[in-house]
Amino acid sequence: MNPLRKKRLLIILAILVGVGIAVGLALSALKENINLFYTPTQIANGEAPLDTRIRAGGMVQAGSLQRSADSLDVKFVVTDFNKSVTITYRGILPDLFREGQGIVALGKLNADGVVVADEVLAKHDEKYMPPEVTKALKDSGQSAPTPAKEG
């Protein structure tokens, strides 16, 4: 083989190996950062993976909020009006967090079926509902409760 062709072949192979490594690293990073959404029904039915970061959302069940007296630990139940799941969280809840309103919690599902959240997101006004929560409520035959009008 001609030395010039051999050099070109080695350069092309090196580029292909580099591109392959870059694509592999990018796919690996994407896989680790994907947080799939699960409804309380899917979590209760065992469809959500254990010890993997997920998003769980629904309506905060009225009367379910429990705050620890001596720490920032919070426990509440989220429902899609079909099934419910308990969520625990350590931290300050968003100002807009209310019972009877939609939330999305990011965290890991433990073996007890409890989502241990490290982030809780509350809807930002009375009309907004995360798309996944809206779909889950629609699928369960329910609709989001409408807030009482002031006046």
From Swiss-Prot:
Chain positions covered by the region annotation Disordered: 131-151
Binding sites annotated in the UniProt record for heme: 124, 128
Cytoplasmic-side positions: 1-8
UniProt topology in membrane: Single-pass type II membrane protein
Spans traversing the lipid bilayer: 9-29
Subcellular localization(s) per the UniProt record: Cell inner membrane
Leader sequence segment: none
Function: Heme chaperone required for the biogenesis of c-type cytochromes. Transiently binds heme delivered by CcmC and transfers the heme to apo-cytochromes in a process facilitated by CcmF and CcmH.
PANTHER family in UniProt: CYTOCHROME C-TYPE BIOGENESIS PROTEIN CCME HOMOLOG, MITOCHONDRIAL
Protein family per UniProt: Belongs to the CcmE/CycJ family.
NCBIfam families: PRK13254.1-1, PRK13254.1-3, PRK13254.1-5
Protein name: Cytochrome c-type biogenesis protein CcmE
The organism of origin for this protein: Pseudomonas fluorescens (strain ATCC BAA-477 / NRRL B-23932 / Pf-5)
